[in-house]
Amino acid sequence: MNHSVFVILITITYFGLNQACIKNIVEILNQLAPGQILEYHCRSEDDNLGVKQLNFNATPFVIRFHDEIPNLTRWNCIFRQGPNNSYSYDIEVYKAGPRLIPRCGQLRVWAARIDGIYFARKYNTPLVRVLSWNKN
């Protein structure tokens, strides 16, 4: 009986929170240079968004999603740029560990610049360089 009550409480908590849970956001920016195109390929365990291109200072590419419970929600993106896409990096752009309560309203901003890849968790904070490009 106690086990059944626990399962019911977890189910109610999950569905109740998931209804009110604001989607998480991964935002990708091309801040390379005028005329420079950022090629990217984003995927999760359940979704493959395919290879896309983003022009310099174009509207950011946005991925909106809910965490999967109790599985590990993870998004990876390969960024490529430069002549013949000779610079690249495969980035884990979002990761939420296994949990019973989902994360809600998380933000991950990733910007490609000539000197590397920049990151922020809030809109009102400056982007910080966290990765250098790999030369293929």
Curated annotation (Swiss-Prot):
Q: Which family does it belong to?
A: Belongs to the plant self-incompatibility (S1) protein family.
Keywords, ordered alphabetically: Glycoprotein, Secreted, Self-incompatibility, Signal
Q: Which PANTHER family match?
A: PTHR31232, S-PROTEIN HOMOLOG-RELATED (PTHR31232:SF113)
Q: Which InterPro entries match?
A: Self-incomp_S1
Tell me yes or no: is Iron among this UniProt entry's keywords. no
* Presence of the UniProt keyword Signal in the record: yes
Gene source species: Arabidopsis thaliana
Question: May I ask which residue range the UniProt record assigns to the signal sequence?
Answer: 1-20
Protein name per the record: S-protein homolog 25
Q: Which residues are glycosylated?
A: N71, N84
Gene from which this protein is expressed = SPH25
Q: Name one GO biological process term.
A: rejection of self pollen
Q: Out of the domains of life, which is the source?
A: Eukaryota
Instruction: Kindly state one GO CC term assigned in the UniProt record.
Output: extracellular region
